[in-house]
Amino acid sequence: MLDFYADWCVSCKEMESFTFSDPRVRAQLDGMLLLQADVTANSDADRALLKRFSLFGPPGTIFFDAQGREIRGLRVIGYQNPERFLRTLSLATAP
């Protein structure tokens, strides 16, 4: 899972405070490889990374399969509450 984050991003803060901190979400994330791209500086490299994944800005969460291919249709753009994010995680981890 690749999560795009920035300190100035209000929705990113909501994801951290409400969704990623939820014990049910944490349990589902256990065992997954979690990466966070901090694009706070909005540098050329940050913008290039966002562009590479066709994102306008954070927050954005992208899921990959065991072979490193993006799981199409499961991107999370913007804030998702814990219940909705759990449904997304279930789809991402389905066999």
Model-found features: residue ranges?
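Structural alpha/beta surface segment adjacent to cysteine/selenocysteine redox centers
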Residues: 44-57
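Typically the conserved alpha-helix immediately C-terminal to a functionally engaged Cys/Sec
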Residues: 11-30
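Short active-site neighborhood of thiol/selenol oxidoreductases, capturing the structured segment around
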Residues: 1-9
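Non-catalytic, surface beta->alpha helical segment in thiol-disulfide oxidoreductase systems
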Residues: 19-24, 56-95
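Short, solvent-exposed loop/turn and secondary-structure capping segments
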Residues: 13-14, 47, 73-75
